[in-house]
């Protein structure tokens, strides 16, 4: 794909590593979760490594480029029920900083750390739903209640409105807008780390 971009456009200005899955499970679930955990490592971490490798040399030859890696706020802290997912995102954080250090003045690197983003299939990979307790804690019951309201027309009470202080979950569109903001900075300005959350979200971190 990188070669096709170069062939058609002559350069690769930006790479966004966005693929990811979230197979939440406790260590006691390891037998049932093993395949999902291995896939998580392949997609969440190795996928980023392969993506960077595909564009690195071209960006260096060009003299400039921008790599945007989608991580997670949960790459910052250990979370019960999220060991493998959290570990892959922590690895992405360190990988991003390593690339930035090695490529200063040639490749800009941004790590984007969202909290919950609706409208994706991320939750479909959860192995044990009870493992969500680690990222929600005491908010788990009210989270479930708000999830129902969020999906019910007429009951969202501002939860779905990005202009409301109660906005409950970032949409893919809103997240994309923040990524565009990062990319649109002058080449000499690099936003290396950004956390994107809804002002009314209920995640612990």
Please identify what each model-predicted range represents.
Residues 101-189:
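SDR active-site lid
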Residues 1-10:
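Conserved amphipathic alpha-helix within the SDR
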Residues 77-83, 167:
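Active-site loop immediately N-terminal to the catalytic Tyr-X3-Lys motif
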Residues 22-38, 61, 81:
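Conserved mid-core segment of classical short-chain dehydrogenase/reductases
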Residues 8-9, 26, 54-63:
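A short helix-coil junction within the Rossmann-fold of NAD(P)-dependent oxidoreductases
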Residues 72:
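Residue(s) in the substrate-gating loop at a strand-loop-helix junction
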Residues 52, 88:
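Active-site helix of classical SDR
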């Amino acid at each position: 794909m990188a070669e096709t971009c170069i062939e058609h456009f002559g350069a690769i200005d930006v790479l966004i590593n966005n693929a990811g899955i979230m197979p939440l499970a406790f260590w006691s679930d390891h037998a049932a979760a093993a395949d999902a955990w291995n896939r998580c490592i392949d997609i969440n971490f190795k996928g980023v490594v392969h993506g960077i490798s595909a564009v690195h040399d071209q960006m260096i030859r060009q003299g400039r480029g921008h790599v945007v890696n989608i991580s997670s706020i949960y790459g910052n802290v250990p979370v019960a029920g999220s060991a493998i997912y959290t570990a892959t995102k922590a690895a992405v954080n360190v990988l991003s900083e390593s690339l930035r250090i090695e490529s200063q003045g040639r490749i800009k690197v941004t790590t984007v750390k969202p909290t919950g983003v609706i409208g994706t299939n991320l939750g479909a990979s959860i192995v044990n739903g009870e493992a969500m307790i680690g990222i929600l804690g005491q908010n788990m019951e009210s989270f479930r209640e708000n999830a129902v309201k969020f999906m019910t027309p007429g009951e969202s009470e501002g939860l779905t409105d990005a202009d409301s202080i109660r906005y409950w979950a970032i949409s893919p569109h809103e997240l994309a807008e923040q990524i565009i903001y990062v990319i649109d900075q002058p080449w000499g300005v690099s936003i290396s780390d950004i956390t994107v959350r809804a002002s009314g979200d209920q995640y612990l971190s």
